[in-house]
Amino acid sequence: MNIAFLPVRCGSKSIPFKNIKSFCGKPLLYWSVKALQESNSIDEIFIGTDCNEIKDVVKDFNFSKVKIFNRSKENARDTSSTESVILEFINKMNFNSLDVFFLVQATSPLVRSIDFDKAYAQYKKEAYDSLLTCVRTKRFFWQD
């Protein structure tokens, strides 16, 4: 099974509730979840949150693959690492060793379903044990 996990908090200090603020007419979180929902490579999508507002917004998406993972308050603090909530999720769920885990950021609204499908195809083809996506950035766009 291919499982996507999005850790999402309400408690951002810089932009409170940023993950559910409107971005192009939908909550920011919507765009990543929609891409996962439409991906042929994803079986289940888990939103890891302790925030009732986020839970309500996600339920309103009405996506068939989406489930809520109730992360602990301890792993929803400003000082909590992404790794700690991933470990909490993996330890509480009943996965098997053949399951594939996708960590997805809610703050990546430009990701598309084909991006997940291509990444998964490459992961399988090359028999990798992990895959990380990134973008090359340039300080000045006019430089090569």
Where are these regions (language model features)?
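Short acidic donor-binding/metal-coordinating loop in glycosyltransferase active sites
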Residues: 73, 106-108
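N-terminal nucleotide-binding beta1-loop-alpha1 segment
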Residues: 1-16
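Short, well-formed alpha-helical segments that are part of the catalytic scaffolds
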Residues: 15-38
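Residues at the starts of beta-strands that form the adenosine-phosphate
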Residues: 1, 43-45, 99, 129
